Amino acid sequence: MLEITGTVAKREMKSQLLDDMELERERGITIKLTPVRMQYKGYTLNLIDTPGHVDFSYEVSRSLQAVEGAILVVDATQGIQAQTLANVYLALEQDLHIIPVINKIDLPASDVPRVTAEIVNLLGCDESEIIKVSAKTGENVDYGLDAIIERVPAPTKTASDETCALIFDSYFDDYRGVIIYVRMFSGKLPKNANIRMMATGSNDIALEVGVLNPKMSPRDELQDGEIGYIVTNLKATREAKVGDTVTLVKAPAHAALPGYKNVRPFVYAGFFPVSNDQYKDLKEALEKLSLSDSALQYEPENSPVLGFGLRIGFLGLLHMDIIRERLEREFGLDLIVTNPSTDYHVVLTTGEEIDIRSASDLPDITRVAEIREPWAKGEIITPKEYIGSILELIVSKRGVQKNISYIDTRAVIDFDAPMANLLTDFYDQLKSATSGYASFNYELGGYHAEDLVRIDFLVAGERIDALSVMAHRSEADAIGREVTKKLKQVIPRQNFEVALQAAIGARIISRETLGAYRKDVTVKIHTGDRDRKAKLVEKQKRGKARMKRFGKVDIPSEAFTVMLKRD
């Protein structure tokens, strides 16, 4: 589209042009959304390239509120995926005009008739409305541009003169501060105007305003209906949150645009530097990343075993993986990341309710009246022949099947399951059970009171708080046995015997023993000197007993990720 409209010269074109981050290019995904303005046949088109992954669905929903139509791109080799459904529902909620496009028709593995039938089934559209393109060769892409002009309405002009602009993204520039992307819904926003963020109450100056072509192009003002950027003097994106409304200080709008909500993380993990000297560097690195990622939340955490670190909240596992990789690559940090967990609502015997984000934070069980765990609403799209194995997998995760519907040759399975059971290896097991053909999407459903316990893991009698995990009582024994076996594989043998135990309170539910190295202390003694041999063996026994009492076991970083690789 950028090439056909002349927005970017052919010599400057490259794949994933709008994906600026190195990680985006490497993984072939969009992590941050990107707006761009194009001119075509006398019309101005504002395109927003959005991430498709469930972790970033709030950003997608905000950007959908900034536009009048959406191009739904479906891979001709893959067909409709679970996240396709999620994003279609978001677009339909906003009453957007959807233009269905099948891409990659040039590939030998493409199955255009099947994917066409799936889209017709999903949207209820006519087959003639679906545009079949190859983004690689450019075939039929101009039909997509024509369809935007024909089917997507122009922004409606409002009678109000109040300045109202929706923030649909923001990022931190090292040299210029916070830059926000906005859609103007009414009024005008001139350069150097005093502006206010209505949800946070922050006041600032619009140092520069303009549009993106896709590079920044300064203008004197932004007008009703336009999509553009504002360079502010703010020092953190949390002061200009996605979904907030920008207005003028001198003539503020009477009401903010609808739909703003605080993004709440539901996956938490402890990040600890391998060297304690790097704790300050970790904190500074996260401060920098959070300037451009308002969804990132963190607080200090102190572990007796791992030392000082941070407990960080994420929107999902992909979000966590991206942040971990950026910390290691961009800031050169060597990290130990503990098992991801979710937050639990704990009702105390006094009636007080508290939230815990780590199993080690659970109060003494005598003070706990009830523990509520988050449940997810999940959706799986799969070829029909895998329905049986998927239902078995859902039941094994304490899930409940709610509904099965069909899109042409594939089934859509709706189910509820505990969020914690989807955070470990559910996705890998799903891919394995369906030979990689199923796709999976989920969202937070609510909190249910369950019979939960905390499993602690002890190494040589010492509780390793970073390994503690919440589990349903019915699953606790199996988890304890499995994890102690895994720990035996990853913790190196010592000069003394080491007990690896799983416990619920004071009750040991599983034990593995890591055998000691055997050093032959009699090797240099003459074979006939039995008394001397016996003395040396006895001395070795006493030494090992002393080491067992006072010896410290070094636990490798792999031990803290064993929960992610459960069978």
Where are these predicted regions, by residue range?
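Structural and coupling elements of P-loop NTPases
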Residues: 1-567
